């Protein structure tokens, strides 16, 4: 009931203003009696992924809490994990406003945020300050003004700084809103990046006597051959996981709607089938050697089950969470327990 009221108010506001209000409110109320307004108890449904055991298979996707300001509040809602970020080595403002658009009739969202964040050092402070023991993945990216050819340096800087504070690290090379970023998904650039990241991971594991798994987040706008090439690179470089998928540049199912022609990545219900197809193809190519975290267009328990059936071991929600609220977490977990 509370979420429906809050949603009604926030949906009258500019989307980005509403987002900042939500994150700020959650930050203020976390670890206080006010968590009763949105907190809930979720039945245990443990799942093992990348050598880690999560209390349930439903996580919050990256992008909602970029700077890790409201982690404890999302823990109260019952998420099995939270993926913060995308974070970059240096703070950056992201792209020009407006850059976030609702497509309410389609339960979709278009964003061209551009990795706006307060920088990795600020994120680390927030990770240290969190009071709960929720699993936190850290999604890392490159700064906009870093040339693509030098992009791996930004990823390595972020890895170095977040390593001790992350349950796992997600390497984001699939956002459509940073010029040239998706080129890192192909050919020599991909192999060089994954090799450098794996080398760094092993160095940090030896230095800190702690192994932190690494996952690669990929786009939905890939051919079968491109998915096969990415899978081969993941296996070759012994990555621990894959996250599929990010937002899409396609506009299937939203033509004619207000805001549908805005540039940026489309998420939410219009992405459901495409992301599931990519998960299925990726699972075929990975042959069970690397687990997949499924994300993209999960708007119901049925959508989540389709991701599991396609080959995902765990799922994440974002746009569906905005449209459905915390109840979606419980619905997915309950359905997962029964499957």
UniProtKB/Swiss-Prot annotation:
Chain positions recorded as FMN binding sites: 62-66, 86, 139, 172, 217, 245, 268, 297, 318-319
Name of the top EC class for this enzyme: oxidoreductase
Main location: membrane
Membrane topology: Peripheral membrane protein
One Gene Ontology cellular component: plasma membrane
Keyword Ligase: no
Matches recorded under CDD domains: DHOD_2_like
Active site: 175 (nucleophile)
Leader sequence segment: none
GO MF terms, alphabetically ordered: dihydroorotate dehydrogenase (quinone) activity
Cofactor(s) this protein requires: FMN
PANTHER family, per the entry: DIHYDROOROTATE DEHYDROGENASE (QUINONE), MITOCHONDRIAL, DIHYDROOROTATE DEHYDROGENASE (QUINONE), MITOCHONDRIAL-RELATED
Assigned protein family: Belongs to the dihydroorotate dehydrogenase family. Type 2 subfamily.
UniProt xrefs under HAMAP family: DHO_dh_type2 (MF_00225)
Protein name: Dihydroorotate dehydrogenase (quinone)
Protein species of origin: Shewanella baltica (strain OS185)
